[in-house]
């Protein structure tokens, strides 16, 4: 049979409708119907026209069509009218993720089906919603909250429910330990500590923690106060001592090695020999020693370990700030860029070229930077290499319009997960179904490999969760193996989505700001999530402090108003434009001021910014601001125009 091009969201609606009406292949007609329904702008009624009678046959797509039709009927005719469709879906496809929604809907009348939902599809969003709604009795609510703590502690409303149940000290130690672990996995270290009780994890509740629970607590407490960090060290050390050969021990050792405290070297030297002689421990100890011999030994022994990659950069940064350019070259050449994840290889190549130029090796520097622009043309180091070579530069004012950016980002791209069913759902414009299938398959476990991070990050973007999705894509870029560089173009595009252009484009034009710079700031500030509020009180897309916003607006604003994307962007663009004016158009100082404040930037005793901009950035005394400047301006450079990396 003649092969036909696969249907996808890239097909024009008119052509899809032609397939839906006239194709002799019923499967192809159903695929067209799903695509048309996903893009239908006429609401539920239009979707019904496309999907009517598409629930035939044993193919899992029939389950999706039945679910969509049942949801449409609920919306149009009420829940009662949809019940026959839900029953049909559950009877014909009991093991398909779509049946979780059937159990949820049918469970409104028969609570035992809600329990069946929690048992069969524990990580499915429908199960998490059912767990949050569990009741009316206290026992049902307790079981629902414990389910959330185990399977979905980040589900909206789960944190409040878990915190409330933690106050019930009649629960068993194992139940309280599960609740504390859930809060830790959701990032609430203080709440987890309160849940553990007065003994803070040292008593019966702490003993009931699993190693995974201790890892979650340690990971969260390491981000807290010095006391919390010390508690994290004790908790992580217990993981290593209890099961030194267990799968959690390695991550515990890595987390212990990352803590920035004077007592860490002694603690690491007390570990069992297996871990004392591991890459993360030896890399951390090498940073405490004078000279570079220990550093070079670690790089040669463990070239593929992330701890070696971090060590190489920390040692090279110390050398470049000291002006030891021969030392920089030695450190960087010991572990070549070709062995690093592409995002780290870009940094490696830039500073190798910089050191070569400082040593008078002009031709070598030019070749190094040209190679960087071939393999890593986007991001901060792509910008700096381009500027150093006298090529294109970053434009803080002007630049491409919203329409031009939209045209370059408009095409749908395959998920390329390697799983046929998942890729098919994505291709047919069903990101929610794809995401739910992924959750069910993985049991809600967080991804750890670059491949899984890339897939889950894009799936989360597909369901509107840029906050977590972009974070996962960033992590994927930092551990992507060099041999998987073919994924880079897709990853780069996913890392730079276009959001809220109707808010950004007019303000960029009004203030003569580069739209890519506005997008770059916002991506780093909030990951395009309007509801975000920082621990310091910054609010909305561009993370404005209420006091700053009130000054810009000419009066106080409620938090609700400040979360409005259009108002937030209007005030944020005005503030950024003011900073650019204050710093005479210098994007480095303006962006640093957006993060740390112009007063702080004014007081830094750093290298001459005009002559040594890259050294000025590396000498910023605040690590957060140092990273922020590179991220924001790298984002802006990548948004300025599409830059396709090569393997």
What is each model feature region?
Residues 1-2, 9-13, 23-33, 43-46, ...:
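Generic helix N-cap/helix-start motif at coil->alpha-helix transitions
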Residues 12, 44-46, 82, 192, ...:
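Single-residue signature of alpha-solenoid repeat helices
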Residues 15, 47-49, 85, 113, ...:
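Alpha-helical solenoid repeat scaffolds, predominantly canonical TPR units
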Residues 18, 88, 116, 198, ...:
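The canonical alpha-helical register within tetratricopeptide repeats
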Residues 40, 73-74, 110, 183, ...:
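Residue at a conserved register position within TPR or TPR-like alpha-solenoid repeats
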Residues 44, 77, 187, 225-227, ...:
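Residue-level detector of the short coil/turn that links helix A to helix B
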Residues 118-125, 135-136, 142-152, 240-241, ...:
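TPR/TPR-like (Sel1-like) alpha-helical repeat modules
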Residues 251, 265, 270, 279-284, ...:
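Catalytic glycan-binding domains that act on GlcNAc-containing polysaccharides
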């Amino acid at each position: 049979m003649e092969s036909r091009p696969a249907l996808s969201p890239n097909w024009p609606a008119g052509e899809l409708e032609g397939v839906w009406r006239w194709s002799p292949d019923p499967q192809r007609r159903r695929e067209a119907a799903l695509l048309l329904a996903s893009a239908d702008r006429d609401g539920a009624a239009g979707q019904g026209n496309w999907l009517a009678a598409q629930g035939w046959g044993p193919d899992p797509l029939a389950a999706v069509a039945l679910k969509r039709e049942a949801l449409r009927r609920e919306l149009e005719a009420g829940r009662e009218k949809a019940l026959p469709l839900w029953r049909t879906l559950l009877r014909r496809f009991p093991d398909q993720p779509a049946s979780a929604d059937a159990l949820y809907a049918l469970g409104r009348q028969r609570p035992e089906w809600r329990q069946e939902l929690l048992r069969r599809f524990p990580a499915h969003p429908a199960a998490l919603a059912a767990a949050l709604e569990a009741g009316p009795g206290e026992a049902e609510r307790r079981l629902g909250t414990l389910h959330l703590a185990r399977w979905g502690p980040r589900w909206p409303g789960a944190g409040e429910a878990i915190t409330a149940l933690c106050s019930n000290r009649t629960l068993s130690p194992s139940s309280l330990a599960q609740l504390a672990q859930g809060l830790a996995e959701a990032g609430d270290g203080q709440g987890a500590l309160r849940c553990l009780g007065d003994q803070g994890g040292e008593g019966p509740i702490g003993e009931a923690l699993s190693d995974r629970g201790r890892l979650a607590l340690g990971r969260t407490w390491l981000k807290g106060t010095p006391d919390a960090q010390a508690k994290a060290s004790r908790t992580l050390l217990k993981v290593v001592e209890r099961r030194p050969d267990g799968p959690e021990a390695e991550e515990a050792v890595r987390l212990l090695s990352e803590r920035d405290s004077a007592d860490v070297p002694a603690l690491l030297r007390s570990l069992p020999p297996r871990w004392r002689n591991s890459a993360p421990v030896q890399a951390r100890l090498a940073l405490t020693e004078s000279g570079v011999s220990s550093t070079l030994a670690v790089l040669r022994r463990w070239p593929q370990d992330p701890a070696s990659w971090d060590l190489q950069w920390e040692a090279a940064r110390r050398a470049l700030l000291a002006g030891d350019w021969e030392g920089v070259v030695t450190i960087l050449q010991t572990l070549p860029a070709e062995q690093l994840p592409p995002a780290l290889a870009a940094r490696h190549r830039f500073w190798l070229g910089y050191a070569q130029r400082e040593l008078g090796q002009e031709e070598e520097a030019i070749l190094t930077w040209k190679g960087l622009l071939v393999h890593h043309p986007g991001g901060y180091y792509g910008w700096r290499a381009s500027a150093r070579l006298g090529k294109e530069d970053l434009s803080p004012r002007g630049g491409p319009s919203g329409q031009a950016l939209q045209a370059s980002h408009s095409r749908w791209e395959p998920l390329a997960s390697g799983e046929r069913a998942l890729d098919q759902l994505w291709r047919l414009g069903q990101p929610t179904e794809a995401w739910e299938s992924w959750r069910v398959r993985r049991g809600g476990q967080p991804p750890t490999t670059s491949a899984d991070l890339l897939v889950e990050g894009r799936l989360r973007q597909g369901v509107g969760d840029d906050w977590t999705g972009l974070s996962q894509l960033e992590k994927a870029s930092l551990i992507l193996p060099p041999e998987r560089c073919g994924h880079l173009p897709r990853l780069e595009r996913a890392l730079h989505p276009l959001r809220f252009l109707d808010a950004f484009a007019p303000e960029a034009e009004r203030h003569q700001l580069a739209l890519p710079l506005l997008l770059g700031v916002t991506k780093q500030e909030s990951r395009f999530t309007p509801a975000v509020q920082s621990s310091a009180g910054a609010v909305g897309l561009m993370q404005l402090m209420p006091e700053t916003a009130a000054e810009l607006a000419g009066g106080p604003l409620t938090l609700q108003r400040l979360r409005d994307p259009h108002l937030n962007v209007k005030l944020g663009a005005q503030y950024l434009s003011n900073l650019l004016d204050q710093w005479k158009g210098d994007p480095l100082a303006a962006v640093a001021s957006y993060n740390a404040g112009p007063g702080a930037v004014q007081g830094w005793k750093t290298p001459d910014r005009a002559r040594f901009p890259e050294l000025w950035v590396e000498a910023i005394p605040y690590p957060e601001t140092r990273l922020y400047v590179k991220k924001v301006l790298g984002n802006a450079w990548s948004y300025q125009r599409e830059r396709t990396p090569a393997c």
